[in-house]
Amino acid sequence: GLGDVYKRQLLHTPEFEHKYFDQREEKKPEDKMIGYIVVTADKGLAGAYNHNVLKLAEQEMAKHKNTCLFVVGQIGRHYFSRKNVTIDAEFLYTAQNPTLYRARAIAETVTDLFERKYLDEVYVIYTKMINSMDMEPEMLKLFPLEREDFEHPLQKQDHDIVTFRPSPEKVMDHLVPNYMKGLIFGVLVEAFSSEQNARMTAMSGATTSASEMIKELSLQYNRARQAAITQEITEIVSGANAQKDES
């Protein structure tokens, strides 16, 4: 995969430096501009799906004074708008229909802003599916790339002679945007799957609760009906007895 290409490139050119690995060390942490892509749903009725991811986003954004917000999903847009939080970009129709085309639009936007040094760090906050029953909000760092994430496991055993043409820099210029597109597409698909799973679980719970409520209401209705019938019979018998006594 692309990750293996990066690993091999760093293995054979350990002194290699590139703009996508720029940690912005010249800036103080409090002065850095941090970008957040927050992935929510377009609709509700999905249990705590939207609440959990928005809660994590707020917690992370509160840690920095300079933030840039990118929102995927109508729920996130409405939520931050109500709180008067500036939304720098919205990606419409993406939450319900994740495609490579839409992933490319997001990747190109944040990559360009990082290249131009408007953004110093970029994260995506979404819902990660653990299994069919469990999911949790997750924050994934996109930029800058970390060298240790691409360390080659066979650094001392790989003796191949590798040449990158036209240059290692040009290779990275081409590979990283494609890598980001694939990474973001994977995030969108996983978030969409988590949303559908959360909605199915919520609807299943609602159906169960509704069935139990109907059962309880039916029981109460039958009790009330039985009590009314008993009351009527009692009144009829009492009336008949009263007439007998009078006669």
Model-derived regions, located:
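C-terminal beta-strand-loop-alpha-helix "lid" module of Rossmann-like NAD(P)-dependent dehydrogenases
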Residues: 1-247
